[in-house]
A protein has these predicted regions:
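Surface-exposed loop/turn segments flanking beta-strands in extracellular/periplasmic regions
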Residues: 246-258, 314-327, 363-370, 422, ...
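Short acidic/polar hinge/loop motifs at secondary-structure boundaries
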Residues: 126-165
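Outer-membrane beta-barrel transmembrane strands
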Residues: 114, 209, 266-307, 377-422, ...
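Transmembrane beta-barrel wall of Gram-negative outer-membrane proteins
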Residues: 203-378, 382-400
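Extracytoplasmic beta-strand/coil segments of soluble accessory domains associated
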Residues: 86-132
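N-terminal periplasmic "start-of-domain" segments of outer-membrane beta-barrel proteins
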Residues: 45-76, 103, 132-143, 192
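Short, polar/charged loop or turn motifs at beta-strand boundaries
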Residues: 45, 63-86, 108-114, 145-151, ...
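N-terminal periplasmic accessory domains that precede
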Residues: 81-84, 88, 107-109, 122, ...
Length: 535
């Protein structure tokens, strides 16, 4: 595997210096020697999670919080944020998800081996909405879980990531049983940065190109506006060998094996294209004790992976109805209500020239009979994927009163949408009229949250510090939508009674009966007490 990367920091550059840097990059690519433009890490890192006291450092926090700085992401070879975190946080796990249905589009990530929706994800301390995909093939950990889509955020937009594992549920509720990850966006009011990264594992395998930029600027004299953008494309990888059944069919005389001589079934990372991510973070001091904040993100990407190979002799519901003893022969007249006239055809044990091959040729010549071997003589492997879009906006006002009461009023809204697509497959129940590409439908997750938070230090003589009393209220609306797909993707066709499968093979579409909107409202209150018993 090889990777090349370059980072340009134009915080203090003039135009001639910036042009010179870009020209130098155009002339030569050097091996990746990443360096940080963030400067030395602060000795006292202020944390947001794990405590509700104002401006506590990581050393003073009562809960163990890990800090991953933004500069740490520059040193990673991957272009995907989840893969970067996997190398930096030992208890964070995410797979490449080959052949995993909808989980191919939004990969489920988890902490400490618990389901993804047991991990609370925050951005700038505010709850992030969940992804639209419910993982049905999650490796035994994420099955049935619905976690946040972390890949929708660009790594260049991050100032740091705070990770809290122990005691998170006691402070933040059952959503945080596995822990909390707080993604803190950059807040510089000047300068910027450009990152360019490219590479591949081997020729034609896993090629990646990524360009990202960040710029900070003043927002009046008392604020900042920081923007980040990333554009990326990643080719699919293949760690496959030829399936033994596909090779046996080819050796037996079937020269139409799907994708031959390449593996009939690909096992590897999916292709990710048109991957666009954008983040904005804005802050403004309204006065000495009050500030306004606004931040959000938008992202979209297309993902294309594969499914398992459909053997042309024994695949149920398509090529056979009895495990491969006989071929599944469709009878047009029977589908119309007449008597069946098409014969039973055994699957050949040898190659071309057998008696059953002769019978198969006769079926192909009979307009009343059909087999899907005519459409896919060497079998087929469906290509599955779709497009994912994600956006979120949060805004609020925080500050303090003359009496020392801290407050934070905020509102946020976020949506994640997955539109599915499958091709190189068919709906067996539709017979020879079946299309080979389908839009099975969509999942949409929408969440709206309103928070009111207060905290105040109360002097208590028996403690080494003030007793911090925090309390608050949250209201959250959650809405999950299933959008119906193409009629052909879920339709029960006239050949169903003859043993042919229903719906687009591999990923059946969502019918109008399955489509709908499900929502609920959540109310929560909390009280939090914190003090230093000793110095």
């Amino acid at each position: 595997m090889w990777r090349y990367s370059m980072k340009i920091d134009f915080k203090m550059m003039d135009k001639s210096q910036l042009l010179g840097s870009l020209t130098a990059f155009a002339l030569i690519l050097t091996p990746a020697l990443p360096f940080s433009a963030f400067g030395a890490d602060e000795v006292e890192e202020v944390v947001v999670i794990g405590t509700r006291r104002e401006a506590r450092s990581i050393g003073d926090s009562p809960a163990p919080v890990d800090i991953i700085s933004g500069s740490d992401f520059v040193n990673q070879g991957s272009g995907d944020l989840q893969d970067m975190i996997r190398t930096l946080v030992p208890s964070f796990n995410v797979n490449t998800q080959p052949i995993s249905d909808a989980a191919t589009l939004v990969r489920p990530a988890n902490l400490r081996g618990l389901p993804p929706d047991d991990m609370l994800v925050l951005t700038n301390g505010k709850r992030r909405h969940r992804g639209a995909v419910i993982s049905f093939l999650g490796g035994g950990v994420a099955d049935g879980a619905q976690g946040a889509d972390i890949s929708a955020m660009p790594a260049i937009a991050l100032k740091k990531v705070e990770v809290l594992r122990d005691g998170a549920a006691a402070q933040y509720g059952s959503d945080a049983i596995a822990g909390i990850m707080n993604f803190v966006y950059r807040d510089e009011a000047e300068g910027g940065e450009i990152q360019i990264r490219t590479g591949e594992y081997s020729e034609g395998d896993g090629g990646m190109f990524r360009i990202a930029a960040n710029v900070g600027m003043p927002f009046t004299a008392d604020g900042f506006a920081n923007f980040s953008v990333e554009l990326a494309d990643s080719d699919a990888t293949s760690r496959s060998i030829q399936r033994t059944d596909a090779q046996a069919l080819y050796d037996g005389g079937n020269s139409a094996i799907w994708n031959y001589p390449n593996p009939a079934q690909v096992w590897g990372s999916p292709e990710v294209s048109d991957d666009v991510k954008f983040v904005a973070n804005i802050g403004l001091d309204l006065d000495a004790s009050k500030k306004f904040y606004l931040f959000g993100n938008y992202g979209e990407r297309k993902v294309l992976g594969g499914f398992y190979y459909r053997n042309p002799t024994n695949r149920g519901g398509i090529f056979s109805a009895d495990g491969g003893a006989t071929r599944l022969v469709g009878d047009v007249a029977e589908a119309a209500g007449a008597a069946r006239t098409c014969p039973v055809v055994a699957v050949p044990e040898t190659g071309a020239g057998s008696a059953s091959d002769t019978a198969l040729a006769e079926i192909k010549a009979n307009p009343n009979c059909f087999v899907f071997n005519e459409m896919f003589p060497g079998g087929f492997t469906p290509s599955f994927g779709g497009s994912v879009s994600d956006w979120a906006v949060a805004s609020g006002v925080s500050g303090s009163t003359d009496s020392g009461l801290m407050y934070d009023f905020s509102v946020s809204i976020g949506e994640n949408r997955a539109d599915f697509y499958i091709e190189n497959t068919l709906n067996g129940s539709l017979g020879p009229d079946s299309p080979t590409a389908f839009n099975p439908g969509s999942y949409v997750q929408l969440e709206k949250t309103v928070n009111v938070d207060f905290s105040k230090g109360v002097p208590v003589d028996s403690f080494a510090s003030d007793l911090n009393v925090a309390w608050g209220v949250e209201y959250r609306e959650e809405q999950f939508t299933v959008v119906s797909g193409d009629e052909e993707s879920w339709e029960i066709g006239p050949y169903f009674t003859q043993g042919f499968g229903i719906g687009s093979n591999g990923f059946g579409g969502f019918s109008p009966q399955m489509a709908g909107v499900w929502d609920r409202g959540n109310y929560a209150v909390y009280v939090d007490l914190e003090a230093d018993v000793t110095e």
